[in-house]
């Protein structure tokens, strides 16, 4: 039917958008794309193969990470975010499942809902925004679109990812954090790291690190 064809076409365009976005990026902690092409009406891309699983897999198998290890991963992904933000790209789906390990180095993947925005904050891509509960801030639940987003949207998700790595638990949804704050972190976590998570996961964008 026409509706199914439209849906397939929308997935094809989303797939190509992700591939074209990543293929323009060159950072040691962002997945590498080697080729993008279409054949017989189907879109393909060739990316680096990473066999070691995601940070989510590691935590599910081994439990919470040490603070030293978790911070090392987060700093490297933070560097990747700083790089894409400099190119006016928001990832918008930072979470442990989207960070793979390649020879013990974290690699950010899944730019399928990333957004490119211009200097005035207007969206220049049209794919819908996804929501990963526990990792998405309040603004991703709103109907305002990308005008309500900025780099601090990714910062919230990065802080939520650090929370998960250190506790082995998915953080509460943003609405609960907004009402009740974050649950207490384990005593073994240093005050500085606990404060960094709390700051990154502030409900209001203006209160997060920029």
Give the location of each predicted region.
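Activation-segment/catalytic-loop signature of the eukaryotic protein kinase fold
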Residues: 36
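AlphaC helix of the eukaryotic protein kinase fold
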Residues: 1-24
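Catalytic-loop of the protein kinase fold
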Residues: 85-101
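C-terminal lobe helix-coil module of Hanks-type protein kinase domains
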Residues: 134-210
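Conserved short submotifs of the Hanks-type protein kinase catalytic core
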Residues: 40-54, 58
